[in-house]
Amino acid sequence: MSNVSPNSMNLNGSTSSTASVNDSGGGGGGGNVTSPTLSSSSASSISNSNSSSSNNLKPSTQPLSSSSTLNTPTQFSLQHSSSSSSLNNTNIDIIEHITISYQDESSIWKYIEAELPNHLPLKNISWKTKTGHTKVVEKMPIEILQYNDERVKAHYDNQNLYKKPYLYLYLVHCDDPDTYKNVVRAKIKQWVTQMTERQQEWLIVYVSLGPKRFSELTSKLTRTVFDRIKNDFNVKRDRCCQLRFLDTNNTSSGNNKDKDNDNGGGSSGTGLSTSTKQQDDLWDDFLIKMKEGIISSAEQYLTTYEDEIRKMDAKRTTPGWSYQNFFFIKEGLALIYERAQLYEDALMQYFELEVLFGDPNNRSQFDQITDEVLQPNSIHCNGNILDTSFKNYRKLIYENKISLFDFKVYLFARQSKLLFLLQKPIEAATKSISFITSMSMIIKQYPNSFAPMFKESWIFSTSMELIKACQDSFDKIVNGAQQQQQQQQQQLQLQQQLQQQQQQQTINGSAQKVVKSISSTTPISKLFGAFGPFGSSSSNTPSSTSATTAANGKNTPMPSNSGIASLSAGGSTIIAGLSGSQSLNNLQSAQLSGALNTQHYIRTPSLNLTSDLSERLTEKQDRESLDFLVGDLLFSSAQRLEELAIIIGYLPVDDYNSEMFFQNVEEVIFKSVENKKIEVDSMTAFSYQPLQVSLQSSKQFTQLYFELLGQIEKLYIQSNRMRSISRLTFAIANLNFKLKEFQIAENLFKSISNLYSREHWSYIEYAVKTRLSYCQKQLGHLVDYVTTCVGLLAPGLLTNRFEKDHYLSEIIQISRKPELNIVQPMIPLFKCKVTFKETVYRYFETIKINVRIKSNLISPIRFNNGAVSFVKSGFGDKLVFQLNDFLVEPGVNNFQFTAVGTTKATFVKDSIWLKIDNLSFGYSLRNADTAIGGGGGGTNTTTTTLPGEIKVIDSESQITLESFANSPLLFYSIQYVGIKLHTHSDTIEAGVLTFTSPTGATIIPTSSVIIIQSDDKTCETSSRTINLINDKLPLSQIGYNQTLEFYLPLMAVNTDTCTHQIRIELQHQKQTKEKFSSSLVSSILFINPLTIDESVINVNNRLFLKTIIQCNSPNMIQFNSYSLEGCDSEYQSPEQQQLQQQLQQQQQLSLSSSSSSISSISSKSSQQPNLYYLVKDHNHSLAPNLNLYPGQLVSLIFEIKKYENESLSSSTSPSSATDSSNSNGNNNNNNNNNNHSKNDLKLKIKYTSKMPQQDLDRPLIRECKSLWRDQNEFSWPIKIELPTYLYQIDLSIQSRAYVGTIVLFEIEITNLKQQQQQQKESNNDNGNEKQQKQQQLQYHIVADSQIWMISGKSKHTFSFNSDTVGEKLKFSCGLIPISSGSLPIPKVTLVGINNSNISYPKTKNEKIFVYPSPQIYSCHQLQDNNNNNNNSINSQTSTNKT
């Protein structure tokens, strides 16, 4: 093996010397590298591999402002003072990649080294994990180390498995087959055996120098050395590849290194020669096999770690489980992911470890909090929070010797590095805030482990460095997007130029020029500059400059990649490095106080980027989010800086929780600084250079502090965080307050004085208002001072009684100054509510309202005057209620304010005022929820008021009328309607009530009315009798709030349910001699007390009248008696009927002319004789005086019968038959003749209406009882519809017979009506109006086939003579019984005739007794008997027909 000068090449092809590279795991310095390396960890490689992830950001069109210093008279650097951070790259700047080891015993590495960068980084590497997920890396830089490099070890365990090379290359060059056979093959075999034992992926690379030999080109039988190698070592997989150099026929070695190829992608175009294509194929084969080996090793390493993690995780609940050991193994998996550029997977491992760290059992495994008591000048406070190179953290974790503080710092640094690599500065800033918060809690929890001022200096330095890192990362993302867009535009231009050149030049020439043009493009990474989380520019990577520095051992100062660049002495800007989302050096800001007093903040656009109008929405949102987080970090830094100033003595102590501020404020401002000031050498007390400079004097601190607050303000304004601006305003105002700049402090405090009161943050509100009040008192702003004192006396703000008394006495003293006129809102000291019962008052009437005042003070206070104003709708007059000289006690106070209504109008609540000397407390009542009462109604007009209104009236009547009744009322009985008269706020000097019924109800006249009079206020009741004059009720001398109640008797005699109207009219005169008239129309429902449903049931020519009676009365009634009129109580002969009719006529003549109309109607209806007589009353079981309640039913059943002579006359007389027919024909109509039909009956019921007992006990009811008729009568008409018989069928049969013998069955059919009338009433010929002289009829014998056999016709057609009434036709047939016993005779019907129109008189024999045969006959004898019977029947039938 030849000694080759160690070189290191980045992926862009630049060659440089090696540089010191630290362990990516944070271990101690890795030392100088003496072996040749091919480093892929430069900033350019990172940017090339990650630039695609920043495409979502819109590039800026303006360059970034990168000035790091200010042009000020006094200027000093805020870089790190630590030499380690100045000489070495921080661990976050160094990115480890996958390594490949090679062994070169033929001294051919120099050829590969020159060409290999043109084919890197590797692209599109993917593999599948055991979970089935596919890991894909688009671009993977690699680092190639020589086999004897100190970083390449012989054996690797779980501690450093992630450092193990992923592929071992064996480079061989041999042209002589014998030499290969005798020497080289054995060496290769030994090397392969060694790799196999280590389970390591390996690859043999055969390098050919010079062009192909003539034998290789002409003979295919000759085996080359490469063919022998493949034959010897390609056993299971092709692990051999070939490269060729120094081929004069191949020009790709010189030009192809500028080619932008894709690994394994084939040739680059059609313009290349055949030898060039073959050379590209060799390189593609080499790269493909290299990627296969890397993938295989990565899967092997991942499997090893995952299996180990799975085993340890399963034992997590067992005693003795070590969290640090588990962390060490799991971090190894994360480091593998990181080297493979799978940053999200690596970050997930750390997040899971952080979650496990939250378990108290795991956290308790850390034996010590810190290695030693940490001082503010220690290395931890010099701003190197992201640098893990100065301490071997992994070794400490492996040995379980790491402290809790170091572990938290290391875990955060690793997470931050991955977040920056993922280009997530916003998430990194969020993580930074939570990390600083948790670390401050640890420092506070273990104060013995940390020296004074360590917490403040550590938080300040850490926050400042994290701010710079986050903003640099964001700037790099934005610039990367901008550079990528520019590069795309350049490529587009080159393509256009190529098309133009192809038209003028040859294909080969044009292709070669295109390659040269592309290769001359500046890499994107070189445009980024120095970035902390991504590494720096080429000077910070393993480049020639850094390598020379490391080789010579000289500590040459280098620009820090993080930290604050400079501090301005002039006060314009403090942090030149805060340029992530805005260029703080170039911002043009107004004065601080003026900006903070502006209510509507205007976001300042970033001058270092394009205008916000041209930025995409996503970038603007990310920019605002980062500005807000950076602002919070910077504000935290400013607070820690202030705490350091307080400790040193530059500022007084800020105790927000101290009570009695008005007593302690003098001591805080004027005495605390002189008493507590200590001598501190900031250069030795702190290791962070900004703190060393800024804390040298009070002036430098003030300058730094105000500039920090100015930058915070701009960040908050640009991120639109108004609440944070308010918090910042308080910090600035408080600092001016301590510096006795009361005018500035007042303006700032006043701008946020009401913000925290609305959100009930009493802690902050107390601090704001106490300081504001002191400033106002010192400046002599007494009116504003009273306002602030009122705010301090709000409930829940002051807890000390002495403070409350102090500020209250201040208010009272200032109110006595005659030159002042102070107006304050009533809330929060007082709450008022105005109520009043009445809303309508008379002209010049005294009006009283109730005012409830709730005082939130702890002491009583006396007011000179109180006023409640009501204003007229629109504008003009006022109604003012007043109360003078009253004392308001703490809590609820009730007062009564009075006023006189001197203006007739409607007044609305306006305001309430409470006055102490020259101080007035006011409150608007326009939208207050005021309870009101009262209200009323007039006689002619209706007075309505809205809530909070008072109406003063003069000429409107408030009297109202009201009627009531136990609706519904009943017909045919005296009923009573109650009437109420309410005077309300009105009076009646004289008046009269008149009663009428527009609908015809009878108002029963009476001589006097009993009136019950009651007072609505005193509830006193009295009764008196008032005599009616001409049916009118006079009224006189009725005062305010009186109610008159009386009952009006009336009766209605309608037959159906109806509504009657009662009109009550009042005419009255007031004391003012004004006359008014009002009326009330009341609608009252009248119903029948009973509802009767009747039905006539015909059972075997017997008529039963069934009535169902239902009680409709709202009250219980007593069923006394009943009678059935229009029906004789018993059968009467015609002579008796004629005699009774004569007696009735004589009685009618003897009646006087003054008889009631009801008796006349009943007399007229009784002149005609009754058609029916009562056979039997089946209701004897009904109890006397039966009580019926509403809804109850009772049933009455009567058996009646119609006189035969009437039936006969109706059937024989043509006129009566026609009337009966018309009555039957209009069966479905109720509009019969006006005269009562002879078929009508009337059910008369006597009942007693019972009122409820509670009504009977009332005095007014008892007085009216004399007019009440106890027993009432109720009549209900009943119409009996009897069927009209058209035909009569008589059946005749002998009473007994024997089974099997023929029985003579005779049928006689009688015509009862004329044939023309039959056609109108029968259902057989509806609608046939044609006159016919004969009607064809057909009878049908319906016999049970199980009992009878019919001998003859079961159906027969016949006809009657049309002019004959009472005509009879006889028919007969033979019936043969086939069953013995009492058998029913068959039924005979007429086809087409309704059975209800056929009369079946009661036959003599409805049944026939059939006996078994008494003799036993032979067949011949039985046949002879049947023939004889048939002959006799036939002869009888022929006789009937004749």
Curated annotation (Swiss-Prot):
Ranges of Low complexity composition bias in the record: 39-86, 535-553, 1208-1236, 1425-1442
Record's keyword annotation contains Transport: yes
Pfam family, one: TRAPPC10
One of the protein's GO biological processes: early endosome to Golgi transport
InterPro entries tied to this protein: TRAPP_II_complex_TRAPPC10_C, TRAPPC10/Trs130, TRAPPC10/Trs130_N
Major location (coarse): Golgi
Subcellular location: Golgi apparatus, cis-Golgi network
Compositionally biased tracts (Polar residues): 1-23, 554-564
Residue ranges of the region described as Disordered: 1-86, 251-277, 535-564, 1208-1238, 1316-1335, 1422-1442
UniProt superkingdom: Eukaryota
Keywords of the record: ER-Golgi transport, Golgi apparatus, Transport
GO CC, one annotated term: TRAPPII protein complex
Function: May play a role in vesicular transport from endoplasmic reticulum to Golgi.
Family under the similarity heading: Belongs to the TMEM1 family.
SUBUNIT field: Part of the multisubunit TRAPP (transport protein particle) complex.
The protein's name in its UniProt record: Trafficking protein particle complex subunit 10
Species, as recorded: Dictyostelium discoideum (Social amoeba)
GN (gene name): trapcc10-1
